[in-house]
Amino acid sequence: MTNFYKVFLAVFILVCCNISHAAVSFIGSTENDVGPSQGSYSSTHAMDNLPFVYNTGHNIGYQNANVWRISGGFCVGLDGKVDLPVVGSLDGQSIYGLTEEVGLLIWMGDTNYSRGTAMSGNSWENVFSGWCVGNYVSTQGLSVHVRPVILKRNSSAQYSVQKTSIGSIRMRPYNGSSAGSVQTTVNFSLNPFTLNDTVTSCRLLTPSAVNVSLAAISAGQLPSSGDEVVAGTTSLKLQCDAGVTVWATLTDATTPSNRSDILTLTGASTATGVGLRIYKNTDSTPLKFGPDSPVKGNENQWQLSTGTETSPSVRLYVKYVNTGEGINPGTVNGISTFTFSYQ
């Protein structure tokens, strides 16, 4: 009987000591390059369709399924951080600056590109909520991918980007797991690449300076405040590359801050109590004035054409308007500039 108990005890101790414990080890590289070396990417877009994102898919990326070896119930998630300056945003995602002309959209996450988190700001953020391995050995990976963004209005050009540090991903143990002295952070640098950027736009066919002769009228034709009479008309014509949608902004040259629909008369005008409004085509609502800028979404910008028109034109009607301050006859002069945006 004594020998039986000794054998039983020995077997019990052997089984006990084979129970696994949560463990992690680093098997990746601390410094990693994103994208192919000397990559080259080409695209065509309208001049003012900015910011313009190059659809490179996942070609500019880094993906590694074997960065940490984990076992025995170890629980791990991932945090990511971008070190580049934020220069704008697109649909809630930060645009990070590389050069004056080129920026980046960045995604970080686990091994699967499609689950990457769109990065915003420069703080650590959760890019993979995590999981707990069972009583077996597995690995935790990660991925980073980017898309270049054209930031500024320019003619067709080639942009070269040098190798640039992007940021980092760190392993985040949780649920009682501990990394101890194991390497938890890996860094990423974007490999150099070239963008071959082709832009499309339009050419103005009518003179850049248009003089509209205003008809002479009597004060009796504008008896009440808000009354209008057609004073003159003109047309603007363009020749456009295929696919370009033209937008335009009128700016009050005398009072550039004017955002109303009444053009300020110049100092050379002698009439008072009268203003000028500008209408396009058959619209019943006058155009409002905005900043002298081709930026997409400029204040009081209006659509002149669709992307299917290669020879767009617009008819503009200038109307006198009684401003309600009492009309005194005289000369009427106004200056408005027009700025086109090719989107």
Curated annotation (Swiss-Prot):
Membrane-spanning residues where?
none
Its keywords, alphabetically, are: Disulfide bond, Fimbrium, Lectin, Signal, Virulence
One of the record's GO molecular function terms = carbohydrate binding
Task: Indicate the principal place this protein occupies in or around the cell.
Answer: other
The annotated region (Receptor-binding lectin domain) lies at: 23-199
Task: Give disulfide pairs as residue numbers.
Answer: 75-132
* Localization in the cell: Fimbrium
Q: Say which family it is in.
A: Belongs to the fimbrial protein family.
Name assigned to this protein: F17f-G fimbrial adhesin
Task: Tell me what organism the protein belongs to.
Answer: Escherichia coli
User: Which gene is the coding source of this polypeptide chain?
Assistant: f17fG
